[in-house]
Amino acid sequence: MMRYYIYVQYWKRFLRLVRSFHWATSNVLLFKSDFGDTFKMRDYNLYEMLSARNGSGGTYFHEACQANSIALLWRAAGMLDESHPRILNIRDYKGAQCTHIIATSNVSCSIDMMNIVLQLGADINGQEGLAGLTPLHICVNKKNYALAEWLCQAPGIDVKVENFGKETPYDLACKMEDRKMMKIFEERSKKM
């Protein structure tokens, strides 16, 4: 039932966006956003749709990641012509970015979803606001081995980022006595 509700909400937003594009393409206006960027009106409407917050503080990308929907992420990626790290790195009211939501869900499509949001400008080493966990820390906690292995090979990953408790992902794996996760980090350090 919840997925149906989310699906309906996305279509409502999409239809509002389509209606606004007609007006925006006939009246191209330049203006400054809150972040100091200059947008055309049609870009601003898309930006507004993707960055609008729901009741839990999440954006379009948070909702798409919570729904484990690659289709919704691809749809947004198709509308964007450049990376938008400001939207993708917004934290919800629990302090989570969309990368943290993906790392929390231990589904088969999590690698593909992470790849999409990273291409759109998400921070691979971003720390969530409560405990300072990176997506890699969360993978260790959730025993998401496939995503942890993929993240360890991703460009720009920093496996030595410490959470607020001064623990790296490897430290967490040792603390949890998770040999499989420790092996992933040890193999990565051999390649470096």
Swiss-Prot record:
The keyword Acyltransferase does not apply. Suppresses the host immune response through NF-kappa-B inactivation. Possesses ankyrin repeat domains required for NF-kappa-B binding but lacks the regulatory regions required for dissociation from NF-kappa-B and degradation. Therefore, prevents host NF-kappa-B release and subsequent activation. Keywords: ANK repeat, Host-virus interaction, Inhibition of host NF-kappa-B by virus, Repeat. Signal peptide: none annotated. The keyword Repeat applies. SUPFAM superfamilies: Ankyrin repeat. GO terms for biological process: symbiont-mediated suppression of host NF-kappaB cascade. It holds the Pfam family Ank_5. It comes from Microplitis demolitor bracovirus (isolate Webb). PROSITE patterns: ANK_REP_REGION. The lineage of its organism: Viruses, Viruses incertae sedis, Polydnaviriformidae, Bracoviriform, Microplitis demolitor bracovirus. This is I-Kappa-B like protein H1. ANK repeats lie at residues 94-126, 131-161, 165-192. Belongs to the polydnaviridae I-Kappa-B-like protein family. InterPro entries: Ankyrin_rpt, Ankyrin_rpt-contain_sf, NF-kappa-B_inhibitor. It comes from the Viruses.
